[in-house]
Amino acid sequence: MSKAAQVVAQQRRALLLGAAASLLPWQIAQAGKQAEEPLANAVQSVLSAAVLDSAPPKPSFDTMDERLVYLRWLGAMSGRLKKKHTEHLTRVDFLEAVWYESKRKGLEPSLVLGLIQVESGFRKYAISSAGARGYMQVMPFWARLIGDGDASRLFHMQTNLRFGCVILRHYLDIERGDLFMTLGRYNGSRGRAEYPNLVFGARKAWDYKAA
């Protein structure tokens, strides 16, 4: 097979994987192995401050219209998540935290939910073969680099979501807004199409357009 044919075959396979992600709501964890990269002292300080902020995941709104948009989103997402988390309060707590942590770092909740679907299948205590933990499959070395060193806390819902969103935002900044490369870096497969396409496909199940 020629190189051109191999590239076409790889692209076709990646597109099929992305389509499958949008059709299969709960997948096996796809966590790779995030690389432990050196951090400049200033960057490390900023990331540490971001994850150690103890503010509760309760969103605030400037207008009633903004609050209504959020409440409609919460209701819609709760319905979509019901098959995985049957207990209403558990779903609401989780979705409130996803909204808060993603918006706090300038990320779309649909992207974060799609990533969680692919990474852990919404399993709080998921552990990958590489040792990544929790909903967003955060590698334990992050607890040492920017946390308090206690990797067991990565199984705590808000802690895991906070670390995951802070790390994803950090990678997005490094990649200058290139989401494809950002997702590859998050998964430890930078430059490869399979993982980003899975997340892009899964994200479609969590898209929400305000009325």
Regions found by a protein language model. Give the residues of each.
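N-terminal secretory signal peptides
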Residues: 1-10, 17-25
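Short, surface-exposed loop and linker segments with low hydrophobicity and enrichment for Pro/Ser/Thr
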Residues: 4-8, 12-13, 99, 107-109
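General helical secondary-structure elements
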Residues: 7-9, 26-29, 87, 199
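Small/flexible residues
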Residues: 14-15, 187
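Cleaved targeting-peptide boundary
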Residues: 31-39
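Catalytic glycan-binding domains that act on GlcNAc-containing polysaccharides
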Residues: 33, 51-211
